[in-house]
């Protein structure tokens, strides 16, 4: 659907989705619904296990609770609307589109800085184990968890305000399955250069600052691990970091591939695959990454289940 609105912004957008084939749409609906249900179960389960087991009331699992909350929210911002579009109407209102873009950017930025906070926690645990409880005080933990949300809100607010000043009256067709910056910028009838530069600075600074702090933390962690004499000690220290490193690698590689490039290099097929990965797949992977290799979480699940059985 195309239409001119006499210099008036469109009232709604049309999300073209991933495919026009009804058979493939139904298959994607079933797949995405299954992934979303597993995402809900995994992240809510992780939050509940950490809350219910006192032995997991530590800074590491405090941050992991918020990571699960962000992943759950992150997926909820995109997946339900995507599922609805696959079955029924693919319309989204102008306000709804920008609201989706705001929360998506807010949660994405918050997760970047939360991963930095988690890296600092691992640095304190491995490099200063005797002073860990003093370093990771309640006040510092609250600061490290509040900061990502505040920065995420500010960055997302600036992003959405700058995007809302653009005009969209030539076309309302978004060649994507959700409201993201690149395909929406492509619809604008006005010059987007300043907006693109601003978004590039926001996204670039977020990725650079968070990646720098994560990298710096792991450089110190690596030097500390190399100084450990026993092989078992090295393996134990490394095992506490491998889950976080894997999560960071997957999350940042897709973000950098998608956002740190000029709009002219936007590729519909490639970018949609990357978007599916970090909006739908990554939120379901994190609970698996942080629990399957974690004996403390497994033991906590057993303890919670045993307490439930004993209480009957």
Swiss-Prot record:
Disulfide bonds join 97-189. Signal peptide: none annotated. InterPro entries: GPCR_Rhodpsn, GPCR_Rhodpsn_7TM, Olfact_rcpt. The keyword ATP-binding does not apply. GO terms for molecular function: G protein-coupled receptor activity; odorant binding; olfactory receptor activity. One of its GO terms (cellular component) is plasma membrane. Gene3D superfamilies: Rhodopsin 7-helix transmembrane proteins. Keywords: Cell membrane, Disulfide bond, G-protein coupled receptor, Glycoprotein, Membrane, Olfaction, Receptor, Sensory transduction, Transducer, Transmembrane, Transmembrane helix. It holds the Pfam family 7tm_4. Its main location: membrane. Residues 48-55, 121-139, 218-237, 293-312 are cytoplasmic. GO terms for biological process: G protein-coupled receptor signaling pathway; sensory perception of smell. The chain crosses the membrane at residues 27-47, 56-76, 100-120, 140-160, 198-217, 238-258, 272-292. It is a multi-pass membrane protein. Residues 1-26, 77-99, 161-197, 259-271 are extracellular. Glycans are attached at residue 6. It comes from the Eukaryota. It is found in: Cell membrane. Odorant receptor. Belongs to the G-protein coupled receptor 1 family. This is Olfactory receptor 8H2. It comes from Homo sapiens. The gene is OR8H2.
């Amino acid at each position: 659907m195309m239409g001119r609105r006499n210099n008036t912004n469109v009232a709604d957008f049309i999300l073209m989705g991933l495919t026009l084939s009804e058979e493939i749409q139904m298959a994607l609906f079933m797949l995405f619904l299954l992934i979303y249900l597993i995402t809900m179960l995994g992240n809510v389960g992780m939050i509940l296990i950490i809350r219910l087991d006192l032995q997991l009331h530590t800074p590491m699992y405090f941050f992991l609770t918020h990571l699960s909350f962000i992943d759950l929210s992150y997926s909820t911002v995109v997946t339900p609307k995507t599922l609805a579009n696959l079955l029924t109407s693919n319309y989204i209102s102008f306000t709804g589109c920008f609201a989706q873009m705001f929360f998506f950017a807010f949660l994405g930025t918050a997760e970047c800085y939360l991963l930095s906070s988690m890296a600092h926690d691992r640095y304190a645990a491995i490099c200063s184990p005797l002073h860990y409880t003093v370093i990771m005080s309640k006040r510092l933990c609250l600061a490290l968890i509040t900061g990502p949300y505040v920065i995420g809100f500010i960055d997302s607010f600036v992003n959405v305000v700058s995007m809302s000043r653009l005009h969209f009256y030539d076309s309302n067709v978004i060649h994507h399955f959700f409201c993201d910056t690149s395909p929406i910028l492509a619809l604008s009838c006005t010059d987007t250069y300043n907006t693109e530069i601003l978004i590039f600075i926001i996204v670039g600074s977020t990725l650079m600052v968070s990646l720098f702090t994560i990298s710096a933390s792991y450089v110190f962690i690596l030097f500390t691990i190399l100084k450990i004499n026993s092989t078992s000690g090295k393996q134990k220290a490394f095992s506490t970091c491998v889950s976080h490193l894997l999560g960071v690698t997957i999350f940042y590689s897709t973000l950098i591939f998608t956002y740190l490039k000029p709009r002219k290099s936007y590729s519909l097929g490639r970018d949609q695959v990357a978007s599916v990965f970090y909006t739908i797949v990554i939120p379901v992977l994190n609970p698996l990454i942080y629990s399957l290799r974690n004996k403390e979480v497994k033991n906590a699940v057993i303890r919670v289940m045993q307490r439930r059985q004993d209480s009957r």
